[in-house]
């Protein structure tokens, strides 16, 4: 069984499509970057820069080589329209496609096989709108699909051209391509509108010289190579198909949908369960039925485009290809063997065996074989002669029976004629009473006598010849005569005892009586020939005739008496009739006496013939007994030879099955299998020689001793080979240890990588905390600067911002380095996974080799034990071998357990690595958040700088106003020197107070805006809290699912504890979130603002009052109160900022913890799923191994019993 090989080839993209492509290819896997759960793995994935020759060398080259060896092969390209299928199959002038490469490679491999003759036939067809057209003969359209036992599924009327070179094939192909249906759509200028199937039929047989012509077996290998270019699936909305193009697209999509359903059902194993697979729903799947789950090597090339526009079509193509990976085929050599070819092959093998027997045995056995052949031939000739005699006797008996039936019919006809004539005579008896009455003329009597004479004179050739081939002895001649006499007497008595007849019927004479009457009329003129005829007639039928005559006379007398008593009117006429009848009775009595004399003579002749027949019968009986004994001897010899031939044929069948298995296994382990095949052939030949020697040389003790010596030599050779096998096993064990070391080294490297990742994470977290602290300090400083109006501090803030930018750039570089390290670790992980896969494949190969070698050694050891029982009784060694085999099995089970533990360790390391990668991703996301926050802080600082610039402008304006006021005050002071000074001071103080109040009002407005921003942030945080709670609810549900699964797994208690701890941590975090009462903070701030506004109103009223009164004491008190209020406002703002920063920190911490918890929960889910799958796999492997071991044990027990029986038979024959 071999699954379908699936390769994926991506079409090159433009620069625009390459930038927006959502697909990511890593090794032999492809996944969507937007949805990482959508991931596909295939046998090979070829990128955009690969060549068609690389695609051909991956699998198609092997399929072409196997087609030359007799295996069917199919390669087809699948994908959406405009994905490069036709380019892959046909190629271009610069780069040939799959079909030209396959054709050239096919002829090159044929030239390498010099020992065979080949005949190549090619055909080229298309399926257009569910109609099959012949591209080599365009007139042949609408061809039909048929199925037969000899040819399988084929297309009737399809032209097949015989080809001899690749150039001829490519010419026919280009001719067919010129007649293929091609159209133009919005997506492709040259779009294939039909499916094409390029088929090569390869017939081959062995080359035979004229001297070896009689020895060849005439076996012909016939294989079919299909290279299919499918039309692409398409959407009418994208292609813009209308009219004919729309109809073509619908037929293409329908056939591809049927292909998809067939692949799906085969991948699900519905055909093996007895379900229906719809091959007949489309002509494409009907033609490709042998390639889909049948007798062929199949490869699928899935062409895709990685552009964003075709993401859905690419996804569906990859899903089809992934389903095709699960479909398995059973490819085998297609060899046509006629009965003559089989006979030739068997004769050849028999002659080889005879030649070996001649080399190993003496001439005495050859003479005995020749004698046995002669006796067999003589017995066959005797059988043929006896069968011919029996056939001749059967024919003669059939002819005799036919003649007797004809004679009986003639006698009945004559009797009816005589009866009619008698009736006529009785009507005219009154007028013709003086005439002589005759019932039959002379000619009729003579004819009848001649016929009777012919029947009597026919003597059977040999009454003692046996009927059939049943070897039973015939009856004696006396018994046959007695049986005939008894049958005639019974017939007579039955006739006589039957009821009373009427007068008219009783008066009618019998046909035999008429014959006697005619003979009475002319007794003197009767010749000797007539007498001899009557004597011959009497030898067979005289007794029943006389009995009939006597019956007739008695009946006639009784009738006469009855008639005399009944006469009344015609007495005279009746008396005459009575007298005539009395005369007739007298004549009959005279004839009776003459017949009695004749009967005595006939009896004497019969006794003489009986004696002669008895002597002949005894001679034939003796000959038959001798022939029977010879036939028995020949049958015994034939049965022996047939048993030997059946045994040889059974061995031959077994060797063919084993050879097929060995051919299949040679692909993986060629060197080891070649050695095993040589050893198996040698042992098989030895076993054949031993069985034939045991059959032909049972009683010869000297040859038996030579066979024992040969067996000892064979056993020595086997021991040497067993020692070699044990050495190879040790080497394999060492290789497994090396692989274990490599696995440990990989584990250590993974651990070191994880440690490095953890260190990087710690450093990033520290840097993040430092950056956050610096940001907080900067925010505080910005707030402080907003209250002050010094330019130097602004410049220092800018410098610090530049420094933070440089630090952020450094952190970005570090993050980039960490990302690069992550990519390197991913590549190392992929390489490690590849190495692990390679190691696993090597392990499977080694296990397979070990199993085969173990089974082989077990078979050979059993054979040794049986032969030693037959020859010398080496039973202890077989027991030891079985114990060693058990130890080896235990060792194999230990190795499997170790491999399973290593696989589990690898799974855990991979999961841990994935966790580390998820943490790195989280760190990158955190850094991005920090960058966004820094950008927002920069924007805020820029806005603050703008505000400070506005404030400086206002200060400049206020200074100019103050200067003007000072000028006016100086002028007033001149006028009013006494009051001017005081007024100027008051005015200056009022102006300063107004400026401070305007600044405070602006600060109040800014605080209000910040409060609004805080409220918005609180709303956002509440929404985030709701989302977090929903995620926690999901986590709880997942945790409940995981907890239900954890009940079934006993060994995962640690993970369950870890999950519970994580759940408790999440609940604790929820409690913390619940404890954070945002509403309380908002209420406090609102109350503080209300108090501030009240104090502000009071101050405004006080200022108005001060303006009205203008007292110096009140102004001093107002200044004090203003200072106190400004300090309070600054404290409140600081508290609000601190609360907001603490709230943001706690929210970010909670989000980070939730994000960190999510991948851990996913990892735990994956671990549980993998553990469950591994348990299922282990159970299935254990069941399969136990069933195999049981079968092997039953088979070995049967062989032991059979060999014991053979030993007993050989001992009995020897004794």
Curated annotation (Swiss-Prot):
Domain Kinesin motor as annotated: residue spans: 3-327
A GO biological-process term: microtubule-based movement
Recorded GO CC terms: microtubule
UniProt keyword list: ATP-binding, Coiled coil, Microtubule, Motor protein, Nucleotide-binding
Alphabetized GO MF terms: ATP binding; microtubule binding; microtubule motor activity
SMART domains xrefs: KISc
InterPro entries according to UniProt: Kinesin-like_fam, Kinesin_motor_CS, Kinesin_motor_dom, Kinesin_motor_dom_sf, P-loop_NTPase
Pfam families in UniProt: Kinesin
Coiled coil: 333-414, 571-646, 708-855, 894-979
Binding site for ATP: 79-86
Family membership: Belongs to the TRAFAC class myosin-kinesin ATPase superfamily. Kinesin family. KIN-7 subfamily.
Entry-linked PANTHER family: CENTROMERE PROTEIN E, CENTROMERE-ASSOCIATED PROTEIN E
This protein's name: Kinesin-like protein KIN-7I
